[in-house]
Regions:
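Acidic/His- and Gly-rich active-site-bordering loop/insert found
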Residues: 2-116
């Protein structure tokens, strides 16, 4: 792994109390409902649903996730759905750094398909 660990955050970058308040409000007002709706959709990974493409559940959760990301109205957000034959689609989005001199990258990875 090339990422530096335990690096100090520059002062003034983020007010922890403001961030916590925002995250708590979002969690209570939006995210819990989004997660509740998501877990009701049986979007199983191909290893557990050979008819995943025909069933369309992964397509549904992908569309819902893309709509949620776009609804956040993040400045500079670029969203793309990457499709390869025979593979589950990938939701890829990129947000440029807020400071031009920033050379750091943050990678977040998750799955929209599930396992029973």
């Amino acid at each position: 792994m090339n990422a530096p660990l335990h690096r100090e955050m520059p002062g003034g970058t983020l007010d922890a109390a403001t961030a916590l308040d925002h995250a708590t409000r979002q969690w209570d007002s939006d995210i819990v409902k989004q997660l509740t709706d998501y877990i009701q959709i049986p979007a199983k990974s191909p290893g557990f649903d050979k008819d995943w493409a025909t069933n369309g559940y992964i397509e549904t959760v992908l569309r819902n996730a893309a709509q949620w990301v776009e609804a956040q109205k993040v400045e500079g957000l670029k969203l793309e759905i990457v499709r390869l034959p025979g593979r589950t689609p990938v939701l890829f989005f990129d947000i440029p750094a807020t400071k031009a001199e920033s050379a750091q990258t943050v990678l977040m990875y998750g799955h929209l398909d599930k396992q029973p």
